[in-house]
């Protein structure tokens, strides 16, 4: 590791192969927590490259437990986290809307690292079993068109990174890598990042990892979700090309809400918020979910504009289909 660390500290990027080999050394338990921490901090100070992200993602995905699903055209909408906005679980709530709208959602996530409630925490509060074996998860996905994939349970290699990440308490390359390593092969993806400087880079990494279409979003203030306030920036991967865009709520037919109005709490509180949204209760939480689900429909290619995606999201919720999708998952991802 010494040579790689010196290279990074000198401001030079590691190749994909170098990163892949170093990641495999970590996965095999050959490096100490201190060595892993120094490596993560050095990468953060230098700035992560596409080759480093790709090499790490390939190593971690290869080490993941495979999900033997029969479904194709899978999508995920998880974000990097680390924005410290303390919002409710936006992408998790939106996942039910997307699944109800006909998108095969392989929702990948974890417990909270820097927030009060991660996707795993809120879904566990809703009665979802985080620890089903891979074969059962595949059955749930095939039947419901939605499954929650608990990263901690499906990425045994993460046990070497998690304690270090908790102690560092800062976003690292691991936040950027998490959304890239879904155990189910993805065709499309909506990926939220708290790093607007990495929008184009992340979209190109997704292209290299085989995504057919993807959208990488950073909201106002570095939120890793689309925000119905301020300016949103995104990179769109479409037809093999990456383009950069921006929009405000008014540009997609929405009124602005305040950040304070979408703050969440601990898992039980966020679970109630999620249910209220799917029950179509008018609120800033609903508007934020509609925006992000609409963006997801657009990222998936199901609609030809963000505005059309928002309209579809409103329709799906109003018809009760999103709430029914929650009930379906609660009935199947149990035991």
Curated annotation (Swiss-Prot):
Organism ancestry: Bacteria, Bacillati, Bacillota, Bacilli, Lactobacillales
SUPFAM superfamilies in UniProt: Nucleoside phosphorylase/phosphoribosyltransferase catalytic domain, Nucleoside phosphorylase/phosphoribosyltransferase N-terminal domain
EC numbers: 2.4.2.18
Gene Ontology terms: cellular component: cytosol
Cysteines engaged in disulfide bonds, as pairs: none
HAMAP family linked: TrpD
Residues reported in the UniProt entry to bind 5-phospho-alpha-D-ribose 1-diphosphate: 79, 82-83, 87, 89-92, 107-115, 119
Species of provenance: Lactococcus lactis subsp. cremoris (strain MG1363)
Pathway involvement of the protein, from the record: Amino-acid biosynthesis; L-tryptophan biosynthesis; L-tryptophan from chorismate: step 2/5
GO molecular function ontology, one term from the record: magnesium ion binding
Cofactor(s) required, per the database record: Mg(2+)
GO BP term (any one): L-tryptophan biosynthetic process
Gene name, Swiss-Prot/TrEMBL: trpD
Name of the protein in question: Anthranilate phosphoribosyltransferase
